[in-house]
């Protein structure tokens, strides 16, 4: 039994060691009339385990006292010269200690991407509960069974070009999922330094409010990050 466990462990280690890793860190500044100024720091890692499968994990902390954990994976379903059809599944957990609340999100969508464009359409649900969890639920527990998610983004060049600019419209980002009618608009770009190091930047506007409650005006955000492919 011990030999079997050791053999399986070595095979798993060898499999993961051969995988292609991507590491990313990103700092962001955000301003809204409801919350004022805030900053956040995020760390993300992606692992390409096979040609048609990758898995990613992300962590974010903000000066407003919000903490987020994002786990996701993608599976390529079909490849053609015109693009790739893929399935994405992500799970997002957000913690709001100041409000004594926590939020669980699950998202499943289909996507189509090619050298210049990416389009995704899917469904998500959300479960919000107090801290600590109550065994019998209660009036403070809410469940949103279905919400439509979408993302449309395009780039001037393909992803192998040494620099690029593009735009994105969606109702979700790595660490937040909004309702279908609340959009994020952003412009983004990157520059490759070589040796697997890439500088990224993004600026955009987004809905105001907290805990997915919207206001009648927008806030804005900007971020700068580094991506490293060992």
Over which residues does each language-model region extend?
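Flexible, solvent-exposed loop segments that connect beta-strands
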Residues: 87-101, 129-143, 175-178, 211-214
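Short glycine/proline- and aromatic-enriched beta-strand/turn motifs that initiate or cap beta-hairpins
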Residues: 19-64, 227-229
């Amino acid at each position: 039994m011990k030999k079997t466990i050791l053999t399986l462990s070595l095979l798993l280690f060898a499999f993961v060691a051969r995988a292609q890793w991507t590491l990313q860190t990103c700092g962001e500044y955000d301003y809204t009339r409801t919350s004022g100024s805030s900053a956040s720091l995020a760390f993300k890692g992606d692992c390409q385990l096979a040609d048609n499968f990758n898995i990613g994990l992300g962590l974010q902390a903000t000066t407003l006292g919000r903490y987020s954990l994002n786990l996701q994976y993608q599976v390529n379903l079909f490849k053609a010269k015109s693009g790739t059809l893929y399935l994405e599944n992500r799970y997002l957990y957000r913690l709001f200690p100041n409000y004594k609340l926590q939020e669980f999100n699950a998202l499943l969508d289909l996507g189509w991407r090619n050298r210049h464009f990416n389009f995704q359409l899917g469904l998500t649900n959300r479960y919000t509960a107090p801290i600590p969890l109550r065994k019998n639920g209660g009036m403070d527990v809410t469940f949103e069974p279905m919400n439509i998610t979408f993302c449309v983004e395009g780039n001037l060049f393909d992803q192998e070009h040494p620099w690029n600019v593009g735009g994105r419209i969606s109702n979700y980002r790595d660490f937040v999922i909004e309702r279908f009618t609340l959009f994020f608009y952003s412009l983004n770009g990157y520059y490759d330094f070589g040796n697997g190091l890439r500088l990224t930047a993004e600026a955009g506007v987004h809905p105001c409010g907290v805990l997915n409650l919207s206001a009648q005006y927008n806030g804005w955000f900007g971020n700068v990050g580094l991506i490293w492919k060992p």
